[in-house]
Design a protein with these regions (language model features):
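Lipid deacylating catalytic domains
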Residues: 1-59, 63-70, 111-179, 185-295
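N-terminal accessory alpha/beta regions
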Residues: 44-103
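Alpha/beta-hydrolase-fold enzymes
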Residues: 89, 95-122
């Protein structure tokens, strides 16, 4: 039995880190979960249980509003106002997540009572309603993620640079688990859908999505996936979706309603940051996927 290999596709807010730091942080979290699953003595006696890991640092490639590569701030941030197109996309996505009653309430609220900076009234009203579900005021993370997902999907030249960079991390002769977190799950799914990775006969055998926004219908529409069409994996790839219902980026739900052959697993990442990649990586479902071929 061979040691498992993982390619991680990271998510948002990684512009100021590095590939080396990402690998260090992911390894630490993965090892914690694997040790919790198998026991410290077993892990010490069989080092093959600790997978090898590669993480292409794609976010270093993107600079906002430019068709160029560079290490500068890459996606829209809290200091930049929403464009009209961003506003429309975020409103569409949040309307997907809100109930009809919540959408009606949003139209009645006074947006001046919520101090969210640089947000237009249409977004602020919906944020106020969504905030009632999540009293810890984490709706800002959802808005940030939606901006970055849209930026990736609506700038094909930049997206192709990201895809080219990520694809280089894969080998057709190394058994591989792909772990995509947040926007990284969208990037990885795009690559699988286009058969740039995980095509028949290649070594990718498992796809793990963590904190994925793929369950939000507006995201799928932006990926040019028609409403009735279900997300899907090639027959030879096992798909595991790990989500925390308190993670707003997931829409507080799994993917089973919008995807075929996916296994949803609910986890509890705690209250500090349910969307944090380290919290997902140290869960037992991810540890099982990371060591499946050895069990």
């Amino acid at each position: 039995m061979e040691q498992q290999h993982i390619v991680g596709v990271h998510g948002i807010k990684q512009g100021r880190t590095s590939r080396r730091e990402l690998i260090k942080d992911w390894n630490k979290a993965l090892n914690r979960g694997i040790t919790a699953l198998h026991g410290q003595d077993v892990v010490r006696s069989d080092p093959r249980l600790i997978p090898t890991l590669e993480i292409p640092h794609w976010s270093s490639l993107l600079a906002r509003g430019a068709d160029r590569l560079g290490p500068s701030d890459f996606f829209p941030d809290d200091s930049t106002a929403l464009t009209a197109d961003e506003e429309a996309f975020i409103v569409e996505a949040m309307d997907d997540l809100l109930t009809p009653q919540e959408r009606a309430l949003a139209e009645e609220l006074d947006p001046t009572t919520l101090g969210l900076p640089k947000l237009p009234p249409s977004v602020t009203r919906r944020a106020m309603v969504y905030d009632r579900r999540t009293p810890d005021s984490v709706v800002g993370k959802l808005i940030t993620c939606l901006r970055e997902v849209r930026f990736y999907l609506k700038h094909p030249n930049l997206a192709s640079k990201v895809q080219e960079h990520v694809v280089k991390a894969f080998s057709d002769d190394t058994a591989t688990v792909v772990i995509g977190h947040s926007l990284g799950s969208v990037i990885a799914y795009d690559l699988i859908r286009q058969e740039q990775i995980a095509a028949p006969g290649t070594a990718v055998h498992t796809f793990v999505t963590c904190g994925s926004p793929l369950g939000i219908p507006a995201v799928r529409r932006a990926m040019n996936i028609p409403g009735p069409e279900l997300l899907a994996m090639p027959a030879h790839v096992k798909w595991l979706n790990v989500y925390d219902p308190d993670d707003v980026v997931t829409g507080a739900a799994g993917l089973a309603l919008g995807a075929r052959n996916v296994t949803d697993v609910e986890v509890d990442n705690g209250n500090i940051d349910p969307h944090a990649v380290q919290a997902y990586l140290r869960t037992l479902p991810v540890a099982r996927a990371a060591t499946r071929s050895l069990s």
